[in-house]
C-alpha cells in the first residue's frame, strides 16, 4: 500500500536511488496504490551522471511492496521493501536493467518490458 509521501527504492539503472510518491494515478480521491499501479514521484536521491536528477518529477510503476498481495488462488506474496521502476509516458521503462524480483501482477497490467528485463518474476 503506497500513499503520498511514501518513499520507495528505485529498482532500475536510471540513476535514481530513492523516490517519494507525490500523486496516485487513477482518480482524484484515491488513497492507496499497490503493485502494478502508476504513481507520480519526486526523485529524492540520485547518483551523479544518471539519466534522472534529484528533484525531477517522474512517473513510476510499483513493482514490490511490503504489504502482502492476495492472489486468486488464496496465496499471499510479500516483499522486503517498497520498490518502483521509473517509466516514460508510453509505459516503457527509462532504464535498461531491473534489479531484484518483481511481482507477476505486472503482466496483467501490460508492463511486459519490465517483466522481460527482471531477473526473477514471483
Swiss-Prot record:
The keyword RNA-binding applies. This is Large ribosomal subunit protein uL14. SUPFAM superfamilies: Ribosomal protein L14. Binds to 23S rRNA. Forms part of two intersubunit bridges in the 70S ribosome. GO terms for cellular component: cytosolic large ribosomal subunit. InterPro entries: Ribosomal_uL14, Ribosomal_uL14_bac-type, Ribosomal_uL14_CS, Ribosomal_uL14_sf. The keyword Ribosomal protein applies. GO terms for biological process: translation. It holds the Pfam family Ribosomal_L14. CDD domains: Ribosomal_uL14. Part of the 50S ribosomal subunit. Forms a cluster with proteins L3 and L19. In the 70S ribosome, L14 and L19 interact and together make contacts with the 16S rRNA in bridges B5 and B8. PANTHER family: 50S/60S RIBOSOMAL PROTEIN L14/L23 (PTHR11761), LARGE RIBOSOMAL SUBUNIT PROTEIN UL14M (PTHR11761:SF3). Belongs to the universal ribosomal protein uL14 family. It comes from Thermoanaerobacter pseudethanolicus (strain ATCC 33223 / 39E). GO terms for molecular function: large ribosomal subunit rRNA binding; structural constituent of ribosome. Keywords: Ribonucleoprotein, Ribosomal protein, RNA-binding, rRNA-binding.
Amino acid at each position: 500500500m503506497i500513499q503520498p509521501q511514501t518513499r520507495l527504492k528505485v529498482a532500475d539503472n536510471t540513476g535514481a536511488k530513492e523516490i517519494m510518491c507525490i500523486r496516485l494515478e487513477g482518480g482524484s480521491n484515491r488513497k492507496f496504490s499497490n503493485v502494478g499501479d502508476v504513481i507520480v514521484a519526486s526523485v529524492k536521491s540520485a547518483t551523479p551522471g544518471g539519466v534522472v536528477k534529484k528533484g525531477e518529477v517522474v512517473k513510476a510503476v510499483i513493482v514490490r511492496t511490503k504489504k502482502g498481495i492476495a492472489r486468486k488462488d488464496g496465496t499471499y506474496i510479500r516483499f522486503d521493501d517498497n520498490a518502483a521502476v521509473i517509466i516514460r509516458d508510453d509505459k516503457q521503462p527509462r532504464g535498461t536493467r531491473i534489479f531484484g524480483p518483481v511481482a507477476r501482477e505486472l503482466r496483467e497490467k501490460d508492463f511486459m518490458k519490465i517483466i522481460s528485463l527482471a531477473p526473477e518474476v514471483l
